[in-house]
Each structure stands twice: as C-alpha cells, then as structure tokens.
Amino acid sequence: MTTIQDIADKMNISKSTVSKALNDAPDISETLRKQVLETAVALGYTKLRRYKKPVKKICIITEKENIQYEEPHHFAYDILLGFRQMAEPAGFDIEIVPVDVQMQRNQRYDVFMLEHDYVGAFAIGFSLNDPWIQEFKTSHTPAVLFDNYIIGNPSTAYVGIDNDEGMELAVSHLAGLGHRKIAYLSGSLGSQILQIRHA
C-alpha cells in the first residue's frame, strides 16, 4: 500500500507537505496540490482517513450535456432517486456532480475522486467520446456505469437494461395493437447503448 512517505520520496518534498496538500491546507499552492494528487493517484494511494469517517461519500456523476435529472419527468430522475434511497440508509452521503467534457479533460477521474474524498461513483449519461469513459478502463476508484460497459477493470461495474427484451416487448405491444409498420428512431450512435440497440 502506498504511503504519504512514498509520495514525498517520489516528489522530493517533505512528508508534511504531502499531507498538507492531500488535506487542502491553505499554505499549499494549487499547482503543488495538483502535482501531489496526480502523483498520489499514479502511485495508487488512497486516503485512509476517508474510510474512517462515519459517513462515506459517493458521487453520482452526470454528463450534463447528455442527461437530465432535476424534474420528475426527466429520464434520470427516478434512477438517481432510487440510488439515493438505497445508499443513504446504508450510511453513504450522496452528492450529484454534473461534469462536462472540458472538466473531464482538465482533471483525471481518480484525481477528482481522491481530491473530493469520494469512495466511489455512479456515472450516468456518458458517451463513448467522453474522456472519463477511457479512464474507467484503468481507474482504481470504484465506479458503477449506467448503460456503459467496461471490460477488464475490477473497479468498474455496469448496470443497465435488457435491450433485447425491451425491444421485443415494445414491438409485441405495438403489433398487438394492430401496427404493422414499426420503426425505431435513435439518437446519434455516440453512446454504447444506442450502438447496441442499433445492431
């Protein structure tokens, strides 16, 4: 397990400076703090103190250009509500964090998670072109992706719907109503789920 001393040795700075940077001390520059966070992630460091806190933080990361969740009629409203209804009674503090492509380019996923003391994330609304989708392939901080599937990373899991059954039910229902010309209208194929449905 990587220690604060390992980070200090790698960066040739003191252990106390690393500790201050990891704990957002005001006398550490933003540049140095970011360098320490990047080095910590590269070495596989996790903040042990975040696991000792009585409340663990999980973020729901929404790709703000692709998903809406604020109102009851929005697609992700009930999904996020259900997630909170299960996680909060289990002792987790849930924060919804909208992100965009620029933010993802500016800060790596693991660094973001370490910086904000999140123990894990639920990610919804991400397209295949989003930078963090690529990072989920090698990230160390646990993430559950909605309708995106990453192979080979034990820290990344997937939840979604059975598209085959959903399409079969929809077509059967419409055919049962007497419809014979049935079409499927899709958005752009920039998301994994739309590519699966298109195939």
Indicate residue ranges for each PLM-predicted region:
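Short, flexible/disordered intra-domain loops and linkers
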Residues: 66-74, 104
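Structural motif
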Residues: 94-115, 167
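Short beta->alpha connector loops
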Residues: 100-104, 124-129
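A short acidic, amphipathic alpha-helical/loop segment
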Residues: 108-109, 131-136
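Periplasmic-binding protein-like
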Residues: 118-125, 183-186
